[in-house]
């Protein structure tokens, strides 16, 4: 398993598989919100597929801590190249007849800007949910990360993410017994 949040004290470890699935669920929801609430036309199912693979290169690279990955534009660019090389390496493990179907999901550099924004927002929302979970367990180590992620989400100016925050995040802050009420009160 590739564990995430390696520089943080975790009350519950989160691995790459768990994060990728949660990100896929959220990306799918953002696509549905785009189509049903904002009358858009994104392919929600395709967003879910991109999100399932969005961190697949970490199978080779490991999880690079976000503060390191985004420390400077030079590091971000270099790491982007590493991710692209890792994605191409993963493609070589797939039978040649199938590679073209995996190329786009595995190579983030081939995504269009709109799909990238939705998956990036889903990734940030998943990270925020991890911070909420840790805070609920009494772990204050995630406080700064939570504030940073909330600010990044606001800066994204993605109405679908704002809608998700307003209508879905409250359920994550409740106990399991109360979460049903939080979800149904959001309309």
How does the language model describe each region?
Residues 1-187:
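Alpha-helical, largely C-terminal catalytic domains
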């Amino acid at each position: 398993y590739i564990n995430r949040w390696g520089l943080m004290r975790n009350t519950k470890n989160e691995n790459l598989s768990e994060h990728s699935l949660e990100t896929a669920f959220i990306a799918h929801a953002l696509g549905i919100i785009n189509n049903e609430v904002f009358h858009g036309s994104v392919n929600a199912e395709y967003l879910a597929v991109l999100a399932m693979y969005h961190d697949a290169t970490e199978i080779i690279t490991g999880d690079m801590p976000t503060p390191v990955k985004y420390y400077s534009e030079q590091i971000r660019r270099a790491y982007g190249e590493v991710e692209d090389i890792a994605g191409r390496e993963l493609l070589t493990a797939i039978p040649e007849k199938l590679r073209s179907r995996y190329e786009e999901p595995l190579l983030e550099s081939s995504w269009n800007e709109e799909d990238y924004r939705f998956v990036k927002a889903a990734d940030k929302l998943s990270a925020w949910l991890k911070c909420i979970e840790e805070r609920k367990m009494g772990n204050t180590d995630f406080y700064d990360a939570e504030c940073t992620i909330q600010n990044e989400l606001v800066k994204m100016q993605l109405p679908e993410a704002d809608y998700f925050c307003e209508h879905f995040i409250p359920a994550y802050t409740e106990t399991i017994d109360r979460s049903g009420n939080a979800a149904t009160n959001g309309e």
